[in-house]
Amino acid sequence: MFGKGGLGNLMKQAQQMQERMQKMQEEIAQLEVTGESGAGLVKVTINGAHNCRRIEIDASLMEDDKEMVEDLVAAAFNDAVRRAEDLQKEKMASVTSGMQLPPGMKLPF
């Protein structure tokens, strides 16, 4: 079924990929991504693990409607999460290149 040394090579490749994925996940968790809303008046910075690191609200918004500011913070956070997920997909693609994964399968499992 497997050629000479095929199973051993397959296991070795799987182990190497697992190590690369672990390293990449650690790197991603350390990255910071900033999302914005309100033309940059609200900025939310999160790390690769989606933990909020910093929120910046332009002073001009402090006089505005509280609900609008809350909506802008939520929108900036959602933008930051989207950017973090896009960055994670990009980084993980380098680890999984050459692998034939089913459509929609997310790594890590």
Curated annotation (Swiss-Prot):
Protein purpose: Binds to DNA and alters its conformation. May be involved in regulation of gene expression, nucleoid organization and DNA protection.
Domain of life: Bacteria
MF-aspect GO terms: DNA binding
Family to which this protein belongs: Belongs to the YbaB/EbfC family.
Subunit structure: Homodimer.
The protein, known as: Nucleoid-associated protein HD_0326
One family name in Pfam for this protein: YbaB_DNA_bd
UniProt-annotated location(s): Cytoplasm, Nucleoid
